[in-house]
Amino acid sequence: MSMSGSKKDVESEKQKALDAAISQIERAFGRGAIMKLKQHPAEKMDSVSTGSIALDAALGIGGLPKGRIVEIFGPESSGKTTLALHVIAEAQKQGGNCAFIDAEHALDTVYARKLGVNVGDLIVSQPDTGEQALHIVEYLVCSGAIDVIVVDSVAALTPRAEIEGDMGDQHMGLQARLLSHALRKLTSVVSKANCILVFINQIRIKIGVIYGNPEVTTGGSALKFYTSIRLDIRKVSAIKDKDNVIGNQTRVKVVKNKVAPPFKQAEFDIVYNEGISKLGEIVDMGVKFGFVEKSGAHYSYGAVKLGQGRENAKGYLKSNPDIANELEQKIRACLAESMHSSDLFAVDERTDVLEEEVF
């Protein structure tokens, strides 16, 4: 027998053995428990916009991926909850159901409404313990009817033993174990339900760190591993109208991304009582892509003079929504073409990524 014939016989036997194993698995666990990917070709991943054009582009797929776990972390008053509420507003615009697990008991419904959230349809829970919060999340995800769930925040998911104990008692690692156990159960059901689970997290300073970044996030290491997206949001500078501070310029770094190239960043304005300024992004990205010409402090769009100074240009676009919409469509078309470019919104890959602290 030739060598080629012998090799074909071996391959045939291996294929028969594989088919038998697959058949046995399907009998034991049901059809769909195992499959070849060619039977289910890859499709474009569904996403929900973050409310920021630049951040949608930096994420690589046009927003936060459905069926995945996301972490948003940063210092106090950096815009974490604002960004999460914008995600809820965008999901509701698509007809989705959303839930907000308010572990901090600090949700401002008036502010949420100003950001575009339909608070009448928003499902809100203010749990007493971390266990209760995560059980509620599990029930909502398993229902298959929720598109976005926001947990605000990880630091406020206090274990029952800590709440029922005395103020000075030590409870090392309780919260980390609670999250680790919950995430092991939630990961698969979040994927099957095609739901976005967003955890908002705080940062702490690790004592005794001389070299490297002393900042750490709360809740242990499990969340870092189970998330598909991690967003580091920071306040860059204040936005002023004469002497009054009216908002913050904000930078978001995509420090982890399992669905597109990571280490990209986006900058946008968060205006008080308004949220993410889409008009500011249109001006900035219009200049970036060459649609808006900036000559000194003057901005123009073709023959149209937008105004002197960035704030005046934003004011003109606010008064002329047709021009703003036209510019936005052109920008989004350019982003769609270059979304997967390695240089678009790229940052240094050596960016310090926060470690996690076990509480």
Swiss-Prot record:
PANTHER family reported for this sequence: MITOCHONDRIAL DNA REPAIR PROTEIN RECA HOMOLOG-RELATED, RECA
Chief location category: cytoplasm
Binding site for ATP: 74-81
Location within or outside the cell: Cytoplasm
Organism this protein belongs to: Anaplasma marginale (strain Florida)
Gene responsible for this protein: recA
Signal peptide range in chain numbering: none
Pfam families in the record: RecA, RecA_C
Keyword field: ATP-binding, Cytoplasm, DNA damage, DNA recombination, DNA repair, DNA-binding, Nucleotide-binding, SOS response
InterPro entries: AAA+_ATPase, DNA_recomb/repair_RecA, DNA_recomb/repair_RecA_CS, P-loop_NTPase, RecA-like_C, RecA-like_N, RecA_ATP-bd, RecA_C_sf
Function per UniProt: Can catalyze the hydrolysis of ATP in the presence of single-stranded DNA, the ATP-dependent uptake of single-stranded DNA by duplex DNA, and the ATP-dependent hybridization of homologous single-stranded DNAs. It interacts with LexA causing its activation and leading to its autocatalytic cleavage.
Entries under CDD domains matching the protein: RecA (cd00983)
GO function terms (MF aspect): ATP binding; ATP hydrolysis activity; ATP-dependent DNA damage sensor activity; damaged DNA binding; single-stranded DNA binding
Protein name: Protein RecA
Single GO BP term: DNA recombination
NCBIfam families in alphabetical order: tigrfam_recA (TIGR02012)
A Gene Ontology term for the protein's cellular component: cytosol
Similarity annotation: Belongs to the RecA family.
